[in-house]
Design a protein with these regions (language model features):
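C-terminal motif of bacterial Sec signal peptides marking the signal peptidase cleavage site
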Residues: 20-22
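Bacterial signal peptide processing site
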Residues: 24-27
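Extracytoplasmic small-molecule ligand-binding "clamshell" domains
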Residues: 29-97
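An extracytoplasmic/periplasmic, membrane-proximal ligand-sensing/linker region
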Residues: 33-56, 234-310
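Short loop->beta-strand "edge-of-pocket" segments that line small-molecule binding or catalytic clefts
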Residues: 36-50, 139-155
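A bilobed periplasmic-binding-protein/Venus flytrap-type ligand-binding module shared by bacterial periplasmic
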Residues: 40-42, 123-134, 228-242
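Short helices/loops that flank or line small-molecule/ion binding pockets
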Residues: 78-92, 105, 138, 182-203
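Pocket-lining segment of extracytoplasmic ligand-binding domains
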Residues: 143-242, 249
Length: 310
């Protein structure tokens, strides 16, 4: 027979075990360092889709380095730079231009760049509908064009310079200019017929096709850019040197992690990549820096003014 004393003893034993487990959990949580990760709103999917693309990668790195990552998607490219410089973000996925802006303010340094088929490059493009008469960049003159964020490499900086190199003044020669904020918004504006041309990355376009976005397959390429250095992962310059080294080592070996399948290692636009290069030279972004110099603050101001015209 189980007496009251025996029952109470059992209850105390269970409570003691629960307390030990709780204390152990608290210690485990305390030993697991948390880092805040901010992702630019760059791809052709939703915010939840962007998080889903990168969560498996950071989970694997977290297990390898005993780290916990809190991922969020920023509202704009500029917000990511501000977060890195204010110390509210430790790591960020950014475009080349965003990286250069943060680097110039001494807020960020390269962490890793995705590698696919031995390369770390991507492309920007100008797209039109299949039924459009627009065939080349020259045909874009007088047409309405949608661009993304003014700090976006592949949905603004590179496409604008492509037009300029084709002899088209984005302020004087375009019929209308729209700044939609994201690649996905520009793509939607084109599909819905609100603009004649949209500027976005090929990764974002291909993700829209893979995701079955209605109308995405009814578009064609007007022009493709030269190869651009792949959007990097960057880390705060404020992080301790030993932590920076831990992060680099973990990303370098992430494809060897037993906790991750090859299809879980993704990069920009949710595309599967082979792994991450932590030795990528910042000098490889010099070509983008040169493109940036062509867009003066005065020209950007005129573009912003034109984009507000209706």
């Amino acid at each position: 027979m189980i007496t009251v004393r025996m029952a109470m003893a059992r209850m105390f034993a269970i409570a003691a075990l629960a307390l030990l487990a709780a204390c152990s959990g608290t210690q485990d949580n305390a030993s697991t360092r948390q880092l805040d990760v901010l992702l630019i709103p760059a791809d052709g999917g939703t915010e939840s889709g962007t998080l889903a693309d990168y969560q498996p990668l950071f989970d694997a790195v977290g297990n390898m380095a005993d780290l916990n990552f809190d991922l969020k998607v920023a509202q704009s490219y500029g917000a990511v730079v501000d977060a890195m410089c204010s110390g509210t973000a430790d790591i960020a996925f950014v475009g080349p231009v965003t990286y250069l802006q943060a680097k110039e303010r001494n807020c960020a340094e390269l962490l890793a760049v995705a590698v696919e088929d031995g390369q770390s490059i991507y492309y920007a493009g100008l797209f039109a509908r299949n039924d459009s008469p627009i065939q080349t960049l020259t045909d874009v003159r007088g047409k309405s064009v949608a661009f993304g964020d003014v700090n976006s490499t592949s949905s603004f900086i590179i496409p604008i310079t492509m037009l300029m190199e084709a002899g088209i003044d984005p302020v004087k020669d375009l019929g209308a200019l729209r700044l939609t904020g994201t690649h996905a918004n520009s793509l939607a504006a084109l599909i819905e017929g609100r603009v004649d041309v949209a500027a976005l990355s090929f990764d974002s376009y291909e993700k829209a096709v893979r995701s079955g976005i209605p109308g995405a397959r009814d578009l064609r390429v007007v022009a493709r850019s030269e190869a651009i250095p792949y959007p990097p992962l960057v880390m705060s310059s404020r992080l301790p040197d030993d932590l920076k080294q831990e992060l680099r080592q973990a990303f370098k070996n992430v494809e060897k992690s037993p906790d991750i399948q090859p299809e879980m290692i993704r990069g920009y636009g949710g595309a599967q990549v082979d792994g991450y290069d932590t030795q990528f030279s910042s000098e490889l972004f010099d070509s983008v820096a040169r493109k940036m110099t062509r867009l003066s603050d005065e020209l950007k101001g005129e573009i912003l003014k034109k984009s507000s015209e209706r």
